Amino acid sequence: MGCVPLWAFADPDPLSVYRWTHRLLVVHVPDTDAGRATLEALRASLHDRREDVRARDLLIVPVGDLPRAGDSLPTAVALGATERLEVRRRLGLQDRVAQLVLIGKDGGVKARQSEAVFDLAGLLALIDTMPMRRAEMP
């Protein structure tokens, strides 16, 4: 009878640690002129709405070429290269397209955007319609 290492039972989903505690905004931005413009617009939106983002337990998970190490996004989660690749694979993100995926506290995909400018206000409004968020609201 052989032994099975404990790590064989670990959840390979790098985002599972956030399940039931946070909503996640997975951001895939390629290193292109358009990608840099998209990232700057998103960074400005996140800065302007930072209190709204925090109130919704929303963490930002960059998994693309941008932002680079040392660049900052409010409430960002730092993943290693292997984890970023695994998240992109699991979510079916395309390499050369800016994409955003909203993941609920239950771990399910709630929305996807592939835009030159992401609609953060629309995503925050969508979160407010979710049953778990409604239960959190005073």
Indicate where each model-derived feature is located:
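Non-catalytic interaction/Regulatory regions outside core domains
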Residues: 2-138
